[in-house]
Amino acid sequence: MACQAGAQDKATPLLVVISIDGLRPDYVTAADAHGAKIPQLRKFLHDGTYALGVTGVIPTVTYPSHTTLVTGVWPAKHGILANQTFDPLQKNHEGWYWYAEDIRVPTLWDAASAAGRTTASIQWPVTVGAKINWNIPEIWRAGTAEDAKLLRVVSTPGLLAEGKAAIGEYRGGIDATPESDEVRGKYAVWILETKRPNLLTLHLIALDHIEHEAQPFSHKAMAVLERLDAVIGKVREAAERVAPGHAFVAVVSDHGFTTYEQQLNLFPAFHKANLFSVDDKGKISDWRAMPWETGGSAAILLKDPKNGLTTATVRALLAKLAEDPANGIDRVLEGEELHRKGGYPNASFFVGLKPGWRTGSGLTGPAVSSIKAGGTHGGLPDLPDLRAAFFLVGPGVPAGKNLGLIDMRDIAPTLAKEAGLSLPSADGTALLP
């Protein structure tokens, strides 16, 4: 498909979507208050349209959120329910939702292809095997040098070798340093200049990584964001250079961030209630009900959702835990209430934690513990700190327009409309006339 390079022309819009994983909107909208030296991102406030916040999805984690960003539907509809697959017996060895075939609805890449346009993507989640002309997906397994071989196999044939010869080695997969994002930015510029795609998606991951370690708005987080700001500027400049007068550039994020110092581990309580069993090697051997933890929340899955006794046992257990404020539980959602919010169609319950808390995953130990402070997400999307970001510039996009608080499902149809694409499967609506 590389023979299609050069498909970008003056009559066809170029859409570039850059995701900064974990970017809270107030890094940009309140840049002065935080002392953020981010001139490129600040230009988006002046030059284009932006949201004060984006209400995300359940759970507020990377893979379901990124899939909503390109489909305009909730996880229950697009099928990417969390980062990692539910795997209580560890048969999938902590595998993630890597594969595009698991997405059940059309994406922006599909819409572009249907319109006869070319597509490119770098490090975007859930793109292994996607029908993208120039694709370097996000995937890793062991975090060793062997991962580079895997990435070469699942990327567009020859693309990484060509890029290496032109601009140097790609740094993919589990590498979440700011240096790795700078390399991804260089690859984005190179692909824009040499392949001329009509749609390019780029996922930058270093900010999320450092926020987990050092919390949002820490000195370390600010230093990383300032480096990513330069990447944003270079990619935007390249887009506007190769498609002068018809380049749209969006900066989005998947979720915000909150801090924690406390941990609630649901597993010991479930084990004590005989809801799962553990073998002599300390591994789960069978289960009736299990938490599926994602940072600031946990879905509760039942092996047999129609088993009334198990349902009643779990309901009583969660009610007892939620009654005690020392456990840090904000809300427990059940069945239809959860499903109306578009998350976890296979879950019977959902436990959302208060800010300052995260879920644990050990099968033993205390239910509640004080731990080293860090950053997390994954909680309910209506928590203000977990709101995501949206900024858009391009021809005809109103300058300095504040959209207020928007629904993440509105982003894909908004981008599709601006780029002249059709995405009727989206449940959101275009935000600009």
What are the residue ranges of the model-derived segments?
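N-terminal signal peptide c-region/cleavage motif recognized by signal peptidases
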Residues: 2-4
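Acidic/histidine-rich catalytic neighborhood
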Residues: 239-249, 253-303
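His/Asp/Glu-rich, glycine-adjacent segments
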Residues: 74-215, 360
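Boundary of Sec targeting at the N-terminus
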Residues: 6-8
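Short, structured active-site-proximal loop/turn typified by the sulfatase FGly-forming signature C/S-X-P-X-R
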Residues: 29-76, 118-120
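Structural recognition of the beta-strand scaffold that forms the well-ordered cores
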Residues: 15-19, 26, 51-53, 68-70, ...
